[in-house]
Amino acid sequence: FLAGDAAHIMPPTGAKGLNLAFSDVHYLSNALIKFYKNNNADDLKLYSEKALSRVFQTVRFSQWMTNLLHTPSKENYLERDLQLNELKELSTSHSGQKVLAENYVGLPY
């Protein structure tokens, strides 16, 4: 079984690698304990599926944040205007701010 950066390398722009590593260790350690205490491998069999689900959610969020916060080329007016519109919407939408905050601090396990 792989965990942390050995399982998934995150770009530093998202600053999410440590969150994912803790999540991996949480799920893997619980699965190993269950296996060795109760001879039950169910959670071990699901570990990769659980981990990958969180990885893809986190990569999607990191990509979204990178696109939101990095300035597009000056010639690309459409991208710039879309980015500004999204930033404006985030500044006024409580539900958007909640989603941003939940993903920024890390998904619950």
Enumerate the predicted regions with their spans.
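Short FAD-binding loop at a beta-strand-to-alpha-helix junction that anchors the flavin cofactor
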Residues: F1-P12
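A conserved FAD-binding loop/helix module that cradles the flavin
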Residues: P12-S23
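C-terminal, non-catalytic macromolecule-binding modules
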Residues: A21, V25, L32-F35
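C-terminal helical "tail/cap" subdomain of flavin- and related membrane-associated enzymes
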Residues: T13-A15, N30-Y109
